[in-house]
Amino acid sequence: MSILKKSLFLVLFLGLVSFSICEEEKREAEEEENEDEIEEESDEKKRESPDRPPGFSPFRIY
């Protein structure tokens, strides 16, 4: 009976460890996706609202 308990605890422990590793990898993947989305949004904002009006040149052309 004690052998069954030990093996059951071992199986449950290993399952818990593998589950937590999978959850950690999933969380890291979601964070990377969020960072990519934030970078894309900031790039789009830079394109939409430039610091200078379109056609503006800081140099004078005579």
From Swiss-Prot:
Expressed by the skin glands. Residues 1-22 form the signal peptide. Residues 25-62 are annotated as: Disordered. GO terms for cellular component: extracellular region. It holds the Pfam family FSAP_sig_propep. The modification Sulfotyrosine is found at Y62. Transmembrane segments: none annotated. It is found in: Secreted. This is Phyllokininogen-1.
